[in-house]
Amino acid sequence: CQYTLNDDKLVDFLDYFEEKGVGVINASPFAMGLLSQRGVPEWHPAPAALVEACRKASDYCLSQGYPIEKLAIQYSVSNPRIGTTLFSSANPDNVLKNIQYIEEPIDWDLVAKVKEIIGDQQRVTWKNT
């Protein structure tokens, strides 16, 4: 979850990884549900302020006719220095939809607006237990 609409800290380490010859795998472009219309599961460890900021971003995307899931996966695969982004779904239709989203051009103006909505919750992370 380190190259997503709400947290792009991974870019801070790309030069180091490249110097060391380390390939990078990004995962969880939907930030474990933060960046989805479905919302986060109860067990999600993100702080409440981040959950709320992502909900507002999702609502805004929906008001623009652009599902946040689409923007989230497009953003997560947009950096050519990150060769792989993993996502999962139990629903084959969602897998196909995500592949379709990846092939479509990203709306960078909407990315900027979503990052503005997320605001000071950008790059906020949580403790893993």
Residue ranges and their predicted role:
Residues C1-N128:
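Beta/alpha (TIM)-barrel catalytic core signal, keyed to glycine-rich beta->alpha loops juxtaposed to Asp/Glu
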